[in-house]
Amino acid sequence: MIKKTLNKNKKKTSLKNKIIKKSNQDFSALKKYLRVVNFIAAAQLYLKDNFFLERELRSEDIKTRLLGHWGGATGVNFLLSHLNFYLKENQKTNPKLRDIIFLLGPGHAFPALQANLFLEKTLSFYFDNQDKNIKNIYDFNLSYNKEGLTHLIKNFGSPAGFPTHASPVTPGAILEGGELGYSISNASGAVMDNK
């Protein structure tokens, strides 16, 4: 009897250790992802050259006109990375999680959303599958590589590049906002619509 109990405890401990090991690996990957999206968001906001810090930063590498808010971007990145992690882990067991709508209130935190869309490869998929008219307007490479990331960072907030807020060319965007009030009223409407 004692031997059976010891074997059961060993099996439980082994399973517990496997779960802890997997959780630690997932958490480590999540932390790395968060650092990368924060870097991409910061680079979009502040850098006009030397995007990969291949040499020391110089004053001419910094944008003279800043469009966006770094403080909002870090919060959005934290929320999106953890939400995506949670959804990835739980959508199979809870199909209702597929109905989540993400509303971005602080419009000037758009570089964070755009960084996440790039890393999850949504931007490249979206622009590769657009009709000819959209491709003529946004004629640049958004491949999931160094060249694509360079285009993303360099063209943020430029006249022929990416807007500084979510817009109709943002994958998944249903309307353009910029202030917290818009997202609160849209969230209220979505809840009332889905009673």
What are these regions (language model features)?
Residues 49, 53-195:
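Cofactor-binding active-site loop characterized by glycine-rich and histidine/acidic residues
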Residues 2-69:
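Cofactor-/ligand-binding subdomain signature composed of acidic, glycine-rich
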